[in-house]
């Protein structure tokens, strides 16, 4: 191989290497945050629809029972979520950082959120849905 080809291949490899580092450290965290925000809204909307169809359901929590009901294993066989739209690990919904999504029940409301990039609950990087909590009747 000629010296010019080796130099060109080395330069291309370095460009690809540095581009991937820049992508991983600067762009990918923003992609994770946006994708988690969309996931939280999707799960929240599905819980809202499920709660309107089954107002007697009291506790909706991050468990295999809730996941199964939303995927269509309910008395109406109605699908509220599709498996391709969610992330499940160890029978729990998880965000794009692979941390469990937080379900909080209080006074008949179900609030869901993600701990965000740093994994600490209750600070300013937590990701909440755009809609208010889901009220049970």
Explain the meaning of each model-derived region:
Residues 41-137:
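Low-complexity, acidic interaction segments enriched in glycine
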